[in-house]
């Protein structure tokens, strides 16, 4: 999709960009694949904020996505490409030959009318899902499982892709979008191709109100808070932090401080750590 720019008719419009949604073929989602979505506003079951800067925004309905891609041997036809308010990628509605309908993440270059398949015998074609051990070296993939049958967990955001680098025993070596190179069980499934809507990261929100429509609340600097609210708070005027390193609101070091567990079980599967 292309990026649409506006003339600076107001301060909010100046610099603001939007996607032109030229790939979207319908604005009516499949009702049987919708579920109610209650707003959490970043709170947990105790009502405490666990994720800051969330709340408000336009009402949404959840689209039930098929991350498992376990409908083996039954061809499906792409009926529509749709917008999904709950993720950066677009989604595709698939009509299977047996009458079932499912949503999948829409890969790049997937068009209405194309046919897709799942299973070990599927062709290496955009939108097809098969075990990593059956995918040739060099192929770009997305929606990768970490455990067979659990459903895709990695590489699902707009414009992302991973590359199959090699095979070693029952494991397949994959370079992820972050630059991390790791081993994943060959029985885990992945979908061929890159995730579509790659222009998503180039969109400029342009004004605070548009961020609020998306459910994003303001981010306040710690240095302008009071000492009771943040370790950086207090002092006269633009006071320095007054500590050896920047701190989180809860007094933990941040900005360069390592937060990964030193003895993480998944370390043995990581060949090269992600780019900093």
From Swiss-Prot:
SMART domains for the chain: Ribosomal_L2 (SM01383), Ribosomal_L2_C (SM01382)
Family annotation (SUPFAM superfamilies): Nucleic acid-binding proteins, Translation proteins SH3-like domain
Pfam families, per the entry: Ribosomal_L2, Ribosomal_L2_C
Positions in coiled-coil regions: none
GO BP annotations listed: cytoplasmic translation
Region (Disordered): 224-276
Keywords: Ribonucleoprotein, Ribosomal protein, RNA-binding, rRNA-binding
MF GO annotations: rRNA binding; structural constituent of ribosome; transferase activity
N-terminal signal peptide: none
Lineage top rank: taxon: Bacteria
Amino acid composition bias (Basic residues), ranges on this chain: 258-276
Keyword Phosphoprotein recorded: no
One annotated Gene Ontology cellular component of this protein: large ribosomal subunit
InterPro entries reported for this sequence: NA-bd_OB-fold (IPR012340), Rib_uL2_dom2 (IPR014722), Ribosomal_uL2 (IPR002171), Ribosomal_uL2_bac/org-type (IPR005880), Ribosomal_uL2_C (IPR022669), Ribosomal_uL2_CS (IPR022671), Ribosomal_uL2_dom3 (IPR014726), Ribosomal_uL2_RNA-bd_dom (IPR022666)
HAMAP family, per the entry: Ribosomal_uL2_B
Family: Belongs to the universal ribosomal protein uL2 family.
Quaternary context: Part of the 50S ribosomal subunit. Forms a bridge to the 30S subunit in the 70S ribosome.
Record-linked NCBIfam families: rplB_bact
Its biological purpose: One of the primary rRNA binding proteins. Required for association of the 30S and 50S subunits to form the 70S ribosome, for tRNA binding and peptide bond formation. It has been suggested to have peptidyltransferase activity; this is somewhat controversial. Makes several contacts with the 16S rRNA in the 70S ribosome.
Protein name: Large ribosomal subunit protein uL2
């Amino acid at each position: 999709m292309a990026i649409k720019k506006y003339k600076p008719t107001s301060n909010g419009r100046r610099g603001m960009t939007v996607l032109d949604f030229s790939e979207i073929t319908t604005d009516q989602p499949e009702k049987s694949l919708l579920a109610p979505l209650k707003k959490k506003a970043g709170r947990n079951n105790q009502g405490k904020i666990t994720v800051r800067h969330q709340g408000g925004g336009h009402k949404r309905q959840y689209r039930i996505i098929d991350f498992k891609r376990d409908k083996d041997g039954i061809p499906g036809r792409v009926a529509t490409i749709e917008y999904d308010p709950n993720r950066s990628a677009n989604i595709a509605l698939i009509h299977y030959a047996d009458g079932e309908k499912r949503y999948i993440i829409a890969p790049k270059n997937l068009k209405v009318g194309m046919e897709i398949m799942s299973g070990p015998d599927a062709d290496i074609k955009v939108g097809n899902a098969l075990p990593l051990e059956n995918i040739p070296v060099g192929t770009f993939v997305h929606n990768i499982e970490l455990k067979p049958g659990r459903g895709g967990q990695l590489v699902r955001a707009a414009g992302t892709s991973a590359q199959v680098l090699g095979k070693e025993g029952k494991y397949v070596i994959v370079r992820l979008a972050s630059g991390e190179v790791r081993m994943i069980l060959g029985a885990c499934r992945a979908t061929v191709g890159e995730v579509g809507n790659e222009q998503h990261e180039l969109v400029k929100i342009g004004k605070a109100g548009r961020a609020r429509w998306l459910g994003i609340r303001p981010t306040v600097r710690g240095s302008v808070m009071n000492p009771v609210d943040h370790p950086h708070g207090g002092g006269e005027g633009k006071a320095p932090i007054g500590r050896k390193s920047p701190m989180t609101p809860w007094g933990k070091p941040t900005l360069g401080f390592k937060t990964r567990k030193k003895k993480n079980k998944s370390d043995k599967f990581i060949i090269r750590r992600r780019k900093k």
